[in-house]
Amino acid sequence: MNNSKNKNEIKFSILKKINNPIELRKLPKKKLIFLCEELREFLIDSVSSSSGHFASGLGVIELTVALHYIYNTPFDYLVWDVGHQAYPHKIITGRRDQIRSIRKKNGLHPFPFREESEYDILSVGHSSTSISASLGMSISARKEGMGRKVVSVIGDGAITSGMAFEAMNHAGDIKSDLLIVLNDNEMSISENVGALNKYSNNFISKKIFPFLKKNGEKLLNKIPRFKKIIEILENKINNYFSPKYLFEELGFNYSGPYNGHDVLLLSNILKKLRLKKGPNILHVITKKGMGYAPAEKDPIGWHAVPKFNLQIGIPPKKQNSLNTYSSIFGKWLCDTAKKDKKLIAITPAMREGSGLVNFSKMYPNQYFDVAIAEQHAVTFAAGLAIGGYKPIVAIYSTFLQRAYDQIIHDIAIQKLPVLFAIDRAGIVGPDGPTHQGFLDLSYLRCIPNMIIMTPSDENECRLMLHTGYQQLGPSAVRYPRGYGIGVKFSNLYKIPLGKGIVLRKGKKIAILNFGVLLIQANIVAKELDATLVDMRFVKPLDNLLLIRMAKTHKALITIEENVIMGGAGSAVNEFIMYNKLLVPVLNIGIPDNFVSHGSQTEVRSSLGLDSIGIKEKIKNWLNFLV
């Protein structure tokens, strides 16, 4: 152990002395190159032994070091968009020795988090929030009058969101002092800008100039002034389609593009930009996964990884014979599209996570990835439905909330047949409070015309997707992250709308389960000799079944992996009270708190949503079971 420790001390001789950016700024500039080498090696070593977001952090090593070297953080505000690229930031802001605990229970938060460090000025997790927040901070800094600077780092797809452009439009209008660093790692803006550049190049090379060179070369040589005009025109067209033109039209001073892996160059540029007034854009070109060849070749596959062997260089696949809910959705989607050419699948930049890879390859004409644009995705689906198609929006629960008005205004009011396949519902786990999906039942249940289904296993998920797809109005199927339980698949059939199933008959109490906690509920039902009902539908409820349960039992227990407030249990409460049914009801779910990170099992246990916790909650509530 001592030999290993000594080797690490030699290996990271500069990094081990950097416990905060103040110590970083004491380094001679020439040593920054060596620090970046050590930081990259340390990040590779730590993530390979602990898991976490990987490729994005490797791409911003030099940028992170340069920003903290030039800016007086934490007095100057450094804001990271999304935050999965912030591991290097955490390492050099006092959390180096804790980095292996990231995303684990009681460990470092997976993203910048205000409660964790004074250097994390904005808690993040969702994309495209940084520019709006940074603009607000810059206005505050101007009113404060102490010379505070504000920097926003955005990229990795976040710039494609409408919110980012809304903020830039505002910033360019009010001319506030703000630096936006566009981290162009070829996974975000580069394709869009590249397409425009390709268009302009084709326009010039294939239409105007070949014709002139072939048929008018002599004329051009005889009329130098005309030749000069053509050259000016070519430059203007190229400028029109460049990032510089785009950002300058929004009111920003544009600098770049520059090599984002040259820490000395970045330091020199940032030193000048720190003194520059008004809204500024620094465009840097980086490579996601830089410094680890397998991640450079496959940045998507290496975006977030479990523990892995550095020498093998292959992201390990989880050994599990069971299917994930995402893959089950993807298989159902392919099977349905084979029979119905009207099916259209839509995802806001979550092709891999939502299980759409195979579908996108098999049915490219029925597949749309709209980028990080949840609002657009939903209203786009509305338009398709009006046009006679059958759209399915595949989206994470936590991201669907970004399109709430569109669900109401563009889908529900018009009773359009759009199916929402809501992945990562309930407890998600290691990505923390920004990614837990436990609000959707509450915010969807209050919307008129909405059908909401909560499958308890993977076969139920298939049946509910099939049922939702047949509806003439909006419907939602919410399912969790992770694997099913291994049940056999039945033939697809349409589930009777709003009908639950009694799985076990007991005495005194009835447990009404909504969703994937059915296994835990079944264990408790057997131990307490309780009736167990798989309610299946949150909306509409099985009213007749509820009346029967209320009249034949002394108490009802509702169980759901959603916040208690406004959720499925609240729907039961409302029904019981409205119908004057004299039976007490205990709602078990997620309390009125945001839930931190940890494994799904750990989080459920801490919330009392495992079988032990559920039984304890029930026994504490029911006097006759004490």
From Swiss-Prot:
CC per GO annotation: cytosol
A Pfam family reported for this protein in Swiss-Prot or TrEMBL: DXP_synthase_N
Entry-linked Gene3D superfamilies: 3.40.50.920, 3.40.50.970
Domain of life, source organism: Bacteria
Cofactor note: Binds 1 Mg(2+) ion per subunit. Binds 1 thiamine pyrophosphate per subunit.
CDD domains cross-referenced by the UniProt entry: TPP_DXS (cd02007), TPP_PYR_DXS_TK_like (cd07033)
Residues annotated as binding Mg(2+): 156, 185
Catalytic activity: D-glyceraldehyde 3-phosphate + pyruvate + H(+) = 1-deoxy-D-xylulose 5-phosphate + CO2
Keywords assigned: Isoprene biosynthesis, Magnesium, Metal-binding, Thiamine biosynthesis, Thiamine pyrophosphate, Transferase
Assigned protein family: Belongs to the transketolase family. DXPS subfamily.
Name of this protein: 1-deoxy-D-xylulose-5-phosphate synthase
